[in-house]
């Protein structure tokens, strides 16, 4: 089921507030504005953000420090406290730590650091942006 993309970040905020999920995943290509959107949502919703870039060990293929990532996410969720996780291939990272997002935001657009082949395969497998709860066309303040 393809969901209609939202046009403004305040509309996204309203929809998230209505659902108030525990785990929000923000996905999209590199350099598209995921971190900026995550920071804005964290500020608006009063919840922390876990940036996958901080847990990277390799770019080709992308790999994370999964034990550390799991610990960071689990500490919030085990206490029933919300958390935002953002980054390229975020759904794969969450799979590796046995977590599922309650709410997925996909930031659409063209990325920048040469992960194109891996991203195309990932988007096909994950059916993004169509399977996301919401899809933005880039994020700009």
Language-model features: locations:
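N-terminal pre-Walker A segment at the start of P-loop NTPase domains
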Residues: 1-19
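P-loop (Walker A) phosphate-binding loop of NTP-binding proteins
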Residues: 29
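Hydrophobic anchor at the beta1->P-loop junction of P-loop NTPases
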Residues: 26
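Conserved nucleotide-sensing/catalytic segment adjacent to the nucleotide-binding pocket
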Residues: 47-101
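Active-site signature of alpha/beta-hydrolase-fold catalytic machinery across serine-
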Residues: 40
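Conserved glycine(s) of the Walker
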Residues: 33
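Hydrophobic positions on the alpha1 helix immediately C-terminal to the Walker A/P-loop
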Residues: 37
